[in-house]
Amino acid sequence: MGDAVISERLLQGVAVVTGATQGLGKSLALELAGLGVTVAAIGRDEAGLRRVAAEATGGRVHPVVLDVGEIGAVPQAFAGIARELGPVTLLINNAAVYPRRDFLEEDPQDFMATVAINLGGVVACSHAALMEMVETGFGRILNVSTFADVLPVPASAGYSASKGAGRVLTRALVADIGDRFPDIVISEWMPGILATRMGKPEGLPALDAAAWGARLALWHDRSLNGRTFVLDRELLEPRSLKRRLLDKLRRRSPVARRL
């Protein structure tokens, strides 16, 4: 067993999963629904979302057609979710695009279209969800991320830059609201390379990764604020030389938490 403790309040609440038409987002929506969570599944393909809803346990997945890159449409979509299902208590920012284009051949407008979804969508959805969460002082946000900012590959400048900015945003949100709303817990999760359209055939099955992601998303603990998990374990922060020496003298060392 891992360290994650599932929050009953989150289980009984309303979760929003973006990019839920296929791949990891679909698997996360189905995993949460299987655990009893009411899920608003956001995506651009209405037919695809309806297929996801048809697969879900107990009719708990509700399709919401939305392009998160259309930032102005996001508040209205979240208002509709609140009216129909109830206030959002959990948001998983998963939606992303990964166009493979050489920067010298790419139109800057296409570059910024990638940023609009991968970063702008996270900003808009997080803001809309937080407007509801601050009313009760409770909530959970999980941002799906990658190491693309530190290990970019060729022909992926837009993806790498936007996902890297998303990583900074996670920490910036905690810095901005963490002291005022400590029970709105914001974390980052890197599921690794998956066997999805954006991943590689030899990658991890999305359903396996989604089991970890759902557990992390439903784990509500103040100590998770600003923390990063990779696959099924916590990524420990680098320690200074002084910290390492003190830990050695005290015969203790940090232990990564597991999902």
Give, region by region, the residue ranges found by the protein language model.
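Conserved glycine-rich cofactor-binding loop
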Residues: T21-Q22
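Conserved glycine-rich Rossmann-like NAD(P)H-binding loop of the short-chain dehydrogenase/reductase
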Residues: L35-R51
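Substrate-binding pocket helix/loop in short-chain dehydrogenase/reductase
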Residues: D102-F103, D110-M112
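Active-site helix of classical SDR
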Residues: S126, S162
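Residue(s) in the substrate-gating loop at a strand-loop-helix junction
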Residues: T146
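C-terminal helical subdomain
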Residues: R180, I184, E188-W189, T196, ...
